[in-house]
Amino acid sequence: MKPSLESDEEEELGALQKTLRERANRSIQHLSSMLAGHSSDSETSEPNQQELLSSVQQNPCSPVQQSEAVSQLRSLLQMKTKDANIQSLSPSRRKLAAKRATDDGSSSQPGVHNLVPIINNQSEYIQHLEAEVKFCKEELLEMKQRVRVVIVENEKLHHELKAKTIEDTLKEYTFVDSTLNMEHTAENTLKERLGSVNQAEDHKWRKEMEQLKCLYQAQTETLEAQVVSLKKDLACIQKEYEESKERLRHKEAMAVAAGTGQRVSGLCLKCAQHEAVLAETHTNVHVQSIERLTKERDELMTVLCSLRASQTDAQQREWGAYQQVKQAVEMAEEANLEKTRALVQCEHFHNELTRQRERLERELASEQDKISQAREAARSESKKEREELMQTLSSLSQKVAELQGLLDRGERDRNSLNSQLEEAYKKLTVQETDSSKMCAELRFLLSQAQLKKEEAERDVRDISSKLGRQLELAEQEVQKLGVELSGYRQRLEEAQRAEGRARAEAAGLAEGLSRAQRQLHLTRQEKEASERCCGEDMAALTFQAQRRERELTQTLQQMEAQHEKSVRETDALLSAQNSLIRKLKEECHTLGAKLEELAQSSRAEMEQLSLEREHLQESAEKLRGRCEEMEEQCVQHGRMHQRMKQRLQQLDQHCQASSQQVLQLLSRQKQLMQERQQLTEDLHSLKSQVHAGKRMDRLAV
């Protein structure tokens, strides 16, 4: 990019130099045509000047209104047209205005934070400078009109001198243009020697400026010498005029004294006649001398008036030229000040641009480091999270498989328990039917016993002793039955404890499902043993009941007296059996309720496990979604990195474009300053021509 920028800058500089040379050639041609042209009368300059002022006042540019230098020049022109006395007061005002302008310019220097708006306002500033240049050109046209008036007055006497001076100036400018064109071609061909060519060009311009300054100084010295000689001539003429005036007065006084002396002296007639003749002749001589002196006096007065008028005109012209030179010098000083300010601002802008570019490069490098670090950190974190998620997914899948196996086992155990409960319920129904049959048989037997009661009463007395023994045996049997019932209760309590253990083990399926299975197996064995014991007990009871029935049938036939006791005993036995059956039913119901509770708890646990499974699946899906989001974020980070790179490239391009704009503005300012210098040189040349014209006028006078 750097060589392309340098080539663009060189091309722009070449184009600016071409435009400057073209403008210089145009100004020289215009000056030559102005000097060669003829104007009919000096009065035409005043209306032209008024028209130019009116046009400037009617068609002001917006940037010119904002310029203080332009407003000062306009006020000076208005002051010139209104009154000549105000011109003497104008320099101090201009100096004060120039000081205010410089103070305002120094106070309005931008800071570092206003760099971007100043760069944006450079185009407006260039338009403003162009407007000032245009106004200076208009002022030059006005000056040219004034110079044209002077040239028209002295055209007949100094035509040859003007032609020679014009030819010399044209030769000098054409020589300068040819050298500049050669240098421009050398710049285009040899871009590497741009600095040396510019230095040589500046050196040549400085030499030409020094030559022009020498010429201007010589012309000013000659004009000053002419003014001094004219002043001396005027003083001599005034002295001669005074001397002639005194002589005339003296002669008049002598003539008056002679006339009065002749009248007073008394003479004779002859002497008086002789004196009268002499007096007439002498009076004629005196009258002639007086008339001659009066004529000389009138001529001298006319010459003096003309000299005074020419002196006043020369003074006025000198004062106008002085004011114009002063204005041009002030404008040149303002232009130099603006140039220095612009150069300082441009250097400041260049430094700020370099600083901003370095700062942006540093920020870009730091941001790239941060982005790379963040990318590496995000990659490491994403890898760690992926590994953790894979581990959690594997562990969760293992847990889900284990829980599925546990659920299958729980369902199998539940099905087996349900089948066992159904079998127990069937057995209980069978036992109830058997007990109902036994009760019916016992009732039938009781009815038969009641029928045989009367017969048994007879045998009661005989069998009372036997019944006592049998009662003792029955009590022993009741005690045995109580012991058996306590054993059954203990077994039931053990079964309840085993069920509680099984419930606790079912609650802790993850810790000891195998233990619960063993305990369930043990409880099944105990339950089967208890059922077998119950069946054996029932069989034993039925056998005992049958045996007792047989004994009762044998004893009832023999002992009617013992019938009531046996009935009571049988009622007690029936009540005990009913209570036992009820207790067994209650225990069966409690066992069924406990089994249902266990089933419900197992179902609740299964539901909890299913919910946990769903929750784990949801968490796994969330983790998967998070992994996908992390991957998308990684992709977005990469895209953001690309966008940041593009943005940084755009910023670099913008900085380069802004630097190019600044270079263009600098070249434009340089061009405008060169135009101002050319305009000042034109002013100096015109002033020198004016002084030369005045000198020739004075010499002609």
UniProtKB/Swiss-Prot annotation:
GO terms for biological process: cell projection organization; centrosome cycle; chordate embryonic development; establishment of cell polarity; microtubule organizing center organization; neuron migration; tube formation. Residues 1-13 have a biased composition (Acidic residues). InterPro entries: SDCCAG8. The keyword Protease does not apply. Residues 119-173, 203-258, 323-695 form a coiled coil. It comes from the Eukaryota. GO terms for cellular component: anchoring junction; cell projection; centriole; centrosome; cytoplasm. Residues 1-67, 84-114, 364-387 are annotated as: Disordered. Residues 45-67 have a biased composition (Polar residues). It is found in: Cytoplasm, Cytoskeleton, Microtubule organizing center, Centrosome, Centriole; Cytoplasm, Cytoskeleton, Microtubule organizing center, Centrosome; Cytoplasm, Cytoskeleton, Cilium basal body; Cell junction. Disruption phenotype: Morpholino oligonucleotide-mediated gene knockdown causes multiple developmental defects, including abnormal body axis curvature, shortened and broadened tails, kidney cysts at 72 hours post fertilization and hydrocephalus. The keyword Methyltransferase does not apply. Keywords: Cell junction, Cell projection, Cilium biogenesis/degradation, Coiled coil, Cytoplasm, Cytoskeleton. Plays a role in the establishment of cell polarity and epithelial lumen formation. Also plays an essential role in ciliogenesis and subsequent Hedgehog signaling pathway that requires the presence of intact primary cilia for pathway activation. Mechanistically, interacts with and mediates RABEP2 centrosomal localization which is critical for ciliogenesis. This is Serologically defined colon cancer antigen 8 homolog. The gene is Sdccag8.
